[in-house]
Amino acid sequence: MKVYKRLYELLGRGYKPLKSARLIKRGKDYYIGITLQKAVKEKKIKKPRYVINVDLNVQRNLACIGIFEVDWEKRESKLYGIKFVNGKLLRLVYKRDYLFEEIRKKQRQTGRSPQVGDNSRLWKKVNNLNRDIALKVAKEISDIAREFSEKGEVIVVFEKLKGLRGRKGRSKKLNRKINFWMRRKIQERVKELGLEEGFGLDFVYPHYTSKKCSKCGYEGERFSPSGSKALFLCKKCGYVVNADVNAVFNQHFLYLSHLLNGGGKARPVVRVGTSLKSPSREGHNLSGVPKATTTFFYISSLLSTF
């Protein structure tokens, strides 16, 4: 009988096994499932040194992560770096989408539901891939939070998930359900890791974060000149930036305004005309963050309560 190293790692970190266990059969193999538990105290963070804003895409870039360092005395926020979670993880997304398309083809040919025959087998693979992707994205986010927790208190901020709205077309509705499930799974896993690692988790309502220019505040639009990546173009100032990065900036501004107003109603606190420097290849090295492409931007956002 094989005993996985992961079990010893968890036991070494203070986890204790429950008395009950269960026997699991997968194919021709049998496994013993053991539930471990650990008592932790949730950490209340009111003035974090680092705010990590996360925009979950789960398609093009699985996640766009902005790491911001906050100086509460000077009321100044500085962007430490931007990281895209994609790379090898996107291969799992492509594999999942391929299987998903196979399910659709078989449904059109046979008229069978996903719970019958080959469709059921393929659907199990899709579910396993979704779970694997969600857990790995959550680990990427948590690795960054844990690294910066060594320097000061950290809060990871996600956009508040909205309820699913009905749309015409079964395929679109199903895609939305899958994406909603993945976002929720990622957030739940990051929360679990945060309780253990000591960093906080919070949410912000996505109030026009993807539609407004993070430089001047005017409304803009997305476009894809090469067909591979989405950019944001401001109709007023002409500012062009990666659309996910623009959303992360706006999300951060909203959350900082929430913190500076003592948890009150969020309102813009970044002065109109705040400069955003162009992307640079130079920057801090986010060590300990594997399998990802990192692009750095810099911003010094002057914060005021007006």
Swiss-Prot record:
Positions binding Zn(2+) in this chain are: C213, C216, C234, C237
A GO term, aspect molecular function: DNA binding
Task: Name its GO BP terms in alphabetical order.
Answer: DNA recombination; transposition
InterPro entries for this protein? Cas12f1-like_TNB (IPR010095)
- Could you name the domain of life of the organism this protein comes from? Bacteria
Work out whether the entry's keyword set contains Ion transport. Answer: no
Keywords on this record?
DNA recombination, DNA-binding, Metal-binding, Plasmid, Transposable element, Transposition, Zinc
Q: Which NCBIfam families does the record cross-reference, listed alphabetically?
A: IS200/IS605 family accessory protein TnpB-like domain (TIGR01766)
Family per record: Belongs to the transposase 35 family.
- Identification of the protein by name: TnpB-like protein aq_aa05
Organism name = Aquifex aeolicus (strain VF5)
